[in-house]
Amino acid sequence: MQKPEGPFGDHLGYYSLAHDFPVMRVTEVLHRAGAIWPFTTVGRPPQEDTMFGAFIHELTAELVPQVFGGVHEVHAVDAAGVHPLLLAVGSERYVPYAGDRQPQELITNGLSLLGTTQTSLSKYVILAAREDDPGLSCHDVPGFFRHVLERLDLSRDLHFITRTTMDTLDYSGISLNQGSKVLWTAAGSPKRALATTLPGLSLPDGFSNPRFFAPGMLVLSGPPHAQPRDTFDPAMENLCQILARADLQGFPLIVVADDADFTAESWDNFLWVTFTRSDPATDTYGLNGFTHCKHWGCTSMVVDARLKTYHAPALSSVAEIEKKVDELALPGRPLYGII
């Protein structure tokens, strides 16, 4: 028997939608006298469970190279909702005599991460080779993105897995539990100098407010999304055609959001919006995009990170509830001195 469950707030920062799930009948709950009943709060990161995630990374750090051959470090990014974004430092040793490294072992590393354990829930997996910078850490998110975006060959280094299983709470895909994944694999010498200033742009109707976010990264505001699920947006394809006329070689990553100011305000906002609101296969567009023997590439990526008509709504604070919690922290109340 199944009954509707939800909506409820989740750890990605949205109200998951109602779905039918099997009913479990509980007849007894046994406990010791004076039992401690653990609970936590979740919502848009960071929340209390953020500390659990940080501790898990610390506990498992030494195990990562043993479980995933060639992988030195992983970072399931809390600000992006954990499962939507996994950063990893891997190895590139397959052809050590080559003049310049290119991603080969890194692809094996990425498929290994997607093939077992909790890392298999990841949606975007971004990998860099330790050989290019022995001091590189994927816990330095801005530094890691800069390293990767300097080295990504966008005609070669994007590897999509389509129509596959997804985290149940991720509504960016084509249906419940189904969507796509992608590997960004970066190795070798830098391919470009990342731009650090905002260029002048001509934008089509509905797109506005271009914002420089970080070296090589640009954010635009787009019109409200109105397409059905599992469908390309003609407006995004038109945007790419127009942007292809501009000199954007220094911007390998362009993000279209509902609110460019909010998205570009901080790394936390950028990561949350970009990676929780996009499906790699459906929402990755590109300047000068092409498909050759089923491999897709471009000269600059454009990620559609707008809220879609089929997404779960974002969590919002309720003033009355916040007031009640604040009152618990007053002198003489249970949470005084704690929060």
Predicted regions span which residues?
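Charged, compositionally biased interaction regions
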Residues: M1-I339
